[in-house]
């Protein structure tokens, strides 16, 4: 038997994939230049072309609340089961949440 991979990006073949019309390394500048304030709701939408600040696959598509900023990245509080976790995500992997 072949040993299953245990890497950080394993089981991400379809999650970290761009559709045909989204291909390219540069994210839309309108999404990157948004300045989020603490308390803003955001959707974690990973851009697989940019590896820095990429969140774990467990948090893909989750809605979180911006807690603060650390360097260029944002601290986002996300619910994972019964526990709230604070993750560090770069703005290329965030979208504003519209209610």
From Swiss-Prot:
One of its GO terms (cellular component) is ribonucleoprotein complex. The keyword tRNA-binding does not apply. InterPro entries: Ribosomal_eL21 (IPR001147), Ribosomal_eL21_arc (IPR022856), Ribosomal_eL21_CS (IPR018259), Ribosomal_eL21_sf (IPR036948), Translation_prot_SH3-like_sf (IPR008991). Signal peptide: none annotated. It holds the Pfam family Ribosomal_L21e. GO terms for biological process: translation. SUPFAM superfamilies: Translation proteins SH3-like domain. Keywords: Ribonucleoprotein, Ribosomal protein. GO terms for molecular function: structural constituent of ribosome. It comes from the Archaea. The keyword Transferase does not apply. HAMAP family: Ribosomal_eL21. Belongs to the eukaryotic ribosomal protein eL21 family. This is Large ribosomal subunit protein eL21. It comes from Ignicoccus hospitalis (strain KIN4/I / DSM 18386 / JCM 14125). The lineage of its organism: Archaea, Thermoproteota, Thermoprotei, Desulfurococcales, Desulfurococcaceae.
